[in-house]
Structure formats: structure tokens, C-alpha cells
Amino acid sequence: MYVSISMYLGSKPIEKDDKIVQDDKPRDCSEILASGRNKSGVHTIWAGEPFPAGKPLQVYCDMETDKGGWTVIQRRGKFPVQQDFYKDWEGYKNGFGNLTEEFWVGNENIYALCLKGCEIRFDLQDEKGIKGFALYQSFSLSSSNYRLSISGYTGNV
């Protein structure tokens, strides 16, 4: 049985015709890492549409796992205060929890983060400390009820 689960989003490589975001308004944790800030923790990003221009979003960035730059979208584990994950539709739409402990970043935020395409990584750890991971090269949510599309698996779970 797994006792620790983390889910991470990573960006697709920036295309030549895309504008590079200024360092002071990164779109995700990979842009924060690319700007030279390499400490894991809570950071502010500015995800694209459907957010209003300039709306900041607080996220937890993992700068260590698999070369870093991952935007953490969920974390569950053994923390002093356990987060209740039995939420309604609005709870999962908007997100909940404490970014430094257990949380869900929110379906609407994940949708906005993955408009240009994402990869997703799942890290698991059991009670004995045995770890596993699954990495999918293509991940997205649709705007209609957040329908999931995922493909391109590699990993050991």
C-alpha cells in the first residue's frame, strides 16, 4: 500500500513562435528553474488563459525530482495535519489544502497550466520506503468537465 503520492506537471518544450515569458512572470516551475531559481518550495506563477491577465497563482515547485522544474499538483503523505480529500466538485475545481503539506492545486488551475501541453509524473512511496514512478509524455484536461487525456507511459509502477 502506498502512503505517499505526489503528482507533478512539466511543460512541453517552448516552440520557436512562442513568446518567452519574462522572468518576473513565469508560466510554470520549469520557467522558474530556467531563470536560475532552483530551490523547491512555494513560488508564484502566472498561468495563461483562462486566467485574467496577470493573475498570480501560488504553487509548490519541485526543483529536485528528475532534473527539477516540476509544478506539483497534488501531494498526500504523512503530515502532522491530514487533509480531507473527500471534497465536492467545487473543491476539486478550485483546489484545497496547504501547499507545504497535503493539497490538490485545482482542476481549473491544471487546465490553465496545460493549455500548451504538459507531461505528468506520479511518484509513489510505500510504508517501507520503496518508491515507484509513472511518467506520461502527454497530458491534458479539456475545458468540458475536465476530461482527461493521457498517453506515452514510462516508469516502474
Q: What do the predicted segments below correspond to?
A:
Residues 1-12:
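Intrinsic-disorder-preferring feature that marks N-terminal prepro/targeting segments
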Residues 17-157:
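Extracellular beta-rich globular recognition domains, centered on the fibrinogen C-terminal
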